[in-house]
Swiss-Prot record:
UniProt cross-references to Pfam families, sorted A to Z: Fer4_12 (PF13353), Mob_synth_C (PF06463), Radical_SAM (PF04055)
Cofactor note: Binds 2 [4Fe-4S] clusters. Binds 1 [4Fe-4S] cluster coordinated with 3 cysteines and an exchangeable S-adenosyl-L-methionine and 1 [4Fe-4S] cluster coordinated with 3 cysteines and the GTP-derived substrate.
Pathway(s) where this gene product acts: Cofactor biosynthesis; molybdopterin biosynthesis
Assembly and binders: Monomer and homodimer.
Source lineage: Bacteria, Pseudomonadati, Pseudomonadota, Gammaproteobacteria, Pasteurellales
Record's protein name: GTP 3',8-cyclase
Species annotation: Haemophilus influenzae (strain 86-028NP)
Enzyme Commission number(s): 4.1.99.22
Binding residue positions for [4Fe-4S] cluster 1: 33, 37, 40
Requisite cofactors: [4Fe-4S] cluster
Catalyzed chemical reaction(s): GTP + AH2 + S-adenosyl-L-methionine = (8S)-3',8-cyclo-7,8-dihydroguanosine 5'-triphosphate + 5'-deoxyadenosine + L-methionine + A + H(+)
Amino acid sequence: MQSIPIKNVGESRLVDPFQRQYYYLRLSITDQCNFRCTYCLPDGYQPEANKPSFLTLKEIIHLAQAFAEMGTEKIRLTGGEPTLRKDFISIAESIANIDGIRQLAVTTNGYRMAKDVADWKQAGITSINVSVDSLDPKMFHQITGINKFDDVMRGIDRAFEVGYNKVKVNSVLMKNLNDKEFEQFLAWVKHRPIQMRFIELMQTGEMDSFFDRYHLSGQILADKLLKNGWTLQHKSHTDGPAKVFTHPDYAGEIGLIMPYEKNFCASCNRLRVSAKGKLHLCLFGEEGIELRDLLQSHEQQAILQARIFAALQGKREHHYLHIGDTGVRNHLASIGG
């Protein structure tokens, strides 16, 4: 069994061969989604017959405890759409109460926010990311396949009402679809404490033609921001991959996630676990390392942690998107994007 380094205060025991420390776990709790986004699940969620069920609450707790003991400080609940789980609140409460977990985030399509966000806050969710790919209701419907724009907007407003100081909003940048709305998004965050994050469209196995048609480099937006007085901010050790820009005249912020940028992987600090219990070292990587067999009792914790650490020693220095290698993933919904 490979030895795991002793953790000092403020350090993670999860260290890869390139000395990157991992403080952040993206945990998918379901593959199911009720939206049909063109860049993710254009045909809607298709359940796979005779496949394992999603991780149980008990298994999720064992997993989160193991990662927390190894230095993970932030867990993000993803999907699919994580709030479709009937035990979503129980999952959030359980993780929020684990020693060492300082941040518990959720990425959601926002369709339940207006009704449920107060319960999320009470359960211990500290931050929310909402997907809003257009501020035009018709374009929103075209991209998501669902006519829920007004519901999502009400949910964002409700999040501020119940006490969230900031909401992060994700938009997948697509040429000739929503790229013309950049100025509209800027106006939207002028007086709202929203971090508006534009995510470059990423190539996946079954979406090659879509990528070729709609991909647009985020560097175009970065250049525009810098030209107009926006300033790039320093990242903390638990932050995600976004480059965040601020402006003294704006209450909100702009984030850019540009996976094709040089050195994108140099600051990687996050691992992923799928809804069925596989560890993924990279969004564009391998088939995954099975963890579920070691999530059945607390007595398995040391073996579980050793398996996680050993797997991490096989992490690549960077992805290979720049040469068209998208890994084995046909789409990103199965491991939370």
